[in-house]
Amino acid sequence: GGHALEQDMSNNEAFKTYIEAKLNLINKLYTSNIANKITVKNTVNCNHAGDFGYMANYAIKLACDNIYKDVEIDIYERFIEHFFYGEHCFIQCHGKDKKYMKNGMPLRLNPVTETFINQYIDRYQIKSKFIHFEKGDLHQIGYDCRKKFDYINFMSLAPPSNWVQHNCADAYSGFTLQIIEKDKRSPTQKNIFIEYSEI
């Protein structure tokens, strides 16, 4: 499944940086009063973080459980998980699992991946009016639409590593903000790009 990545921080530095940055982001969202409740969904079955991803996100969950009353931290340990919001079902994964996949899911939907996703939808008897399959891994924005579901790729918040630049092109960094209405098909979506000098 996974591949080794060069690190420019020790494990301790990476843990500290991740915890501080994520808690800072959650605190800014919470104090902005942007929503009545904040849910943070973490996909930890991936080819990057290993057990570190679970441990770091569990530490954040423990902290948030003791600090905030309206912040929920979900940690997805299976490769693919889904949740419902109104007429929507969101199916989420990293795009490449931590153990079995030789290659990750593609940027553009292909017949093999489409069949795989349709089998997941059928297995879990997902009947939602709007189904969105969301993933990362390739650090690039991508969108395909089929009759049964949308296929969405998100960029990475972090700058691309040397490995990503070599294998996936010199991608951009940032995040996607989505506003989803419970009963409408298309979310309002805005991509926020971060210049490396801003980090």
Explain the meaning of each model-derived region.
Residues G1-N66:
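Core catalytic region of metal-dependent phosphoesterases/phosphodiesterases
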